[in-house]
Design a protein with these regions (language model features):
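Surface-exposed amphipathic alpha-helical tracts and adjacent flexible/coil segments at the periphery
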Residues: 1-166
Length: 166
């Protein structure tokens, strides 16, 4: 998945560059990569994060709820109606975004946002959605469109040369 690779590599490149800058070191390759987006690992395939083993033995490092990607946490459902829901706080959900949540039985359910009007989100399915459920966005349409654009990433390599007449 090209979007996952671009996002993940972009994130780690940014983190490595920050570490190198703090330690006054340089990478072995030449050039600079300029992503046309802000890398965010929660926006592409993601099963959560762990610091497994970094601070000693670790318990509870798995994702017992589902082996699937939940995506980024968007908010908590304030009201669940027959064909829409509202969230307790601000959000940027948009038409075409994929969302998921755990129902009252702990089963993962998913839907696609058909439209957003004012504070109401109209998904294609609302079955099992209740107030208090946490909504995750597992498909950010706008972010993925940015990642898959031909201009989403640029690499620049400095060149130095001398011109002289013959």
């Amino acid at each position: 998945d090209i979007a996952y690779v671009k996002n993940t590599v972009g994130f780690y490149r940014r983190e490595l560059d920050a570490v190198l800058a703090r330690k006054k070191r340089a990478k072995s390759s030449s050039g600079t990569v300029i992503p046309g987006f802000v890398p965010d690992p929660a926006k592409t395939f993601n099963r959560g994060f762990t610091d497994f083993g970094l601070k000693g033995p670790t318990a509870g490092w798995s994702s017992p709820g589902t082996p699937k990607s939940l995506g980024e946490r968007i908010g908590t459902v304030a009201k669940a109606a027959k064909d829409y829901f509202t969230l307790t706080g601000p959000h940027d959900l948009a038409n075409g975004d994929g969302i998921c949540f755990f129902d009252a039985r702990g089963e993962l359910r998913g839907s696609v946002v058909n439209s957003v009007a004012n504070d109401r989100v109209y998904p294609d399915k609302t079955g099992g959605l209740t107030a208090g459920a946490v909504i995750y966005r597992n498909h950010d349409r706008a972010f993925l469109k940015t990642l898959t654009a031909k201009t989403s990433c640029e690499r620049r390599i400095a060149v130095s040369f001398v011109l002289s007449g013959t």
